[in-house]
């Protein structure tokens, strides 16, 4: 009967979603973005599948509800993950669907697991509270098998920060659902401070445990983590993590830091051997940024002397220089990895605040040169960076590029393929010490 009660709730919610359209999130909407590209405050119902299209005029991208009387905000605290806010509209209430005991009480386990595997990952935490058996659903091999074969939920933004007294906080913004979710992060050790990045459902952190530089990998949805063995050289390094889903393994690459010892060899951790291996020392170069980009089994860094890029081949463990000169008057630049072999350079151009602009280039591997592919519209640039001296952060995944600045409580998202700019707002982006990266929620990503 516990299962039956949940299916009545689940099916009734789906029916309501189909009849009344999708609800909108109550995260603060950016007012200076034009209506054709604003996505900051729209919410797709968490019961709707990833990538589903919103056909409701109120929930369609680019529309805003400007009438306060049409919207009623209801604070909620769902079980497990806490959804920030939910906005409900005065529409016709549909009665709960009546379920037949003889059908739903005898649902085969394999069919049940296949259905649950298609539920958005953040809803699984609510499902776990239905009964003791479902509380162990994440350890069920049958469920994990179905989950691994289902298409990805879609890209998310993971923000991490620490409140006083150093309590870790984490929120995830689902781009398909247009909703913020809070994830408990108290399972992390206190020394985990720097967010290295995310890949394939895993998130990597580093920090100083006393005088020892340590690295850990965790799965936020599974609340599981483990500390990696110590590197051969105990010094803070630039790190990047890559996951290979085909053999369920991951690697962490440690290179020379922009301010660190340049004579240290490159180290690579392989989860299959649980060891760090030593590789070629990066040739003597003057790095101009601590940001790295990984695509097509290659790691890229920016260099000033010699001018261009340093590329590390993960398969051979060798470094080589690429003489790709940067665009003229480039003030600051970030390397961003796209899909397949695409490598982007994002940065500001200009000498004075009135002449500055944000541009995006793509590396032409054949001609070894940067080709401009897009420019940030002036209104977005002025809203993102109100002062010419303001710093910004930039990161990307799957041809999506996200911009954040230190004095803004919102992020700017650019879709390279669709050429669409859109704002992302929410309380998780308002913390001055928050660290952000793209994140793919997965239950089958193992830290072992």
Swiss-Prot record:
| Kelch repeats by residue range | 201-245, 298-339, 342-390
Superkingdom of this entry's organism? Answer: Eukaryota
Keywords, A to Z, come to: Kelch repeat, Repeat
Q: What segments bear the compositional bias annotation Polar residues?
A: 19-30, 51-70
Question: Which ranges carry the F-box domain?
Answer: 101-146
Q: Which cysteines are joined by disulfide bonds?
A: none
- Show the Pfam families listed in the entry: Beta-prop_KIB1-4, F-box
UniProt xrefs under InterPro entries? F-box-like_dom_sf, F-box_dom, Kelch-typ_b-propeller, KIB1-4_b-propeller, SCF_F-box_component
Region named Disordered = 19-79
Q: What is this protein called?
A: F-box/kelch-repeat protein At5g15710
Originating organism: Arabidopsis thaliana (Mouse-ear cress)
């Amino acid at each position: 009967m516990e299962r039956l009660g949940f299916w009545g709730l689940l099916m009734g919610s789906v029916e309501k979603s189909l009849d009344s359209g999708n609800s909108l999130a109550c995260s603060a909407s950016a007012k200076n973005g034009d209506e054709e590209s604003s996505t900051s405050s729209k919410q797709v119902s968490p019961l709707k599948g990833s990538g589903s299209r919103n056909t409701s005029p109120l929930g369609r991208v680019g529309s805003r509800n400007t009438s306060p009387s049409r919207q009623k905000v209801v604070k909620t605290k769902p079980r497990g993950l806490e959804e920030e806010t939910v906005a409900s509209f005065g529409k016709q209430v549909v009665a709960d669907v009546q379920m037949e005991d003889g059908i739903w009480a005898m649902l085969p386990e394999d069919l049940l697991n296949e259905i649950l595997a298609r539920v958005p990952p953040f809803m699984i935490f609510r499902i776990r509270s239905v009964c003791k058996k479902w509380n162990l659903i994440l350890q069920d091999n049958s469920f994990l098998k179905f989950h691994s074969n289902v298409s990805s939920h879609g890209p998310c933004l993971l923000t991490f920060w620490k409140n006083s007294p150093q309590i870790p906080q984490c929120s995830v913004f689902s781009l398909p659902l247009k909703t913020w979710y809070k994830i408990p992060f108290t399972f992390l050790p206190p020394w985990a401070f720097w967010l290295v990045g995310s890949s394939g459902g895993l998130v990597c952190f580093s920090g100083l445990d006393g005088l020892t530089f340590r690295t850990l990998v965790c799965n936020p949805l599974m609340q599981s983590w483990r500390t990696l063995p110590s590197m051969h050289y105990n010094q803070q390094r630039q790190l990047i993590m890559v996951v290979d889903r085909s053999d369920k393994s991951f690697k962490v690459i440690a290179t020379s830091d922009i301010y660190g010892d340049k004579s240290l060899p490159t180290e690579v951790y392989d989860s299959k051997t649980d060891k760090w291996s030593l590789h070629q020392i990066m040739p003597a170069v003057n790095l101009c940024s601590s940001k790295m980009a990984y695509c097509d089994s290659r790691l890229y860094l920016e260099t000033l002397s010699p001018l261009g890029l340093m590329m590390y081949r993960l398969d051979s463990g060798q470094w080589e220089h690429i003489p790709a000169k940067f665009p003229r008057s480039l003030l600051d630049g970030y390397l961003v990895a796209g899909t397949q072999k695409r490598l982007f350079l994002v940065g500001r151009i200009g000498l004075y605040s009135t002449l500055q602009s944000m541009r995006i280039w793509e590396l032409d591997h054949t001609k070894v040169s940067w080709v401009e592919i897009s420019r940030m519209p002036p209104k977005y640039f002025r809203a993102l960076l109100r002062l010419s001296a303001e710093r910004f952060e930039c990161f990307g995944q799957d041809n999506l590029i996200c911009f954040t600045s230190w004095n803004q409580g919102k992020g700017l998202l650019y879709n390279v393929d669709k050429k669409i700019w859109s704002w992302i707002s929410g309380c998780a982006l308002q913390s001055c010490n928050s660290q952000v990266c793209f994140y793919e929620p997965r239950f089958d990503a193992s830290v072992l």
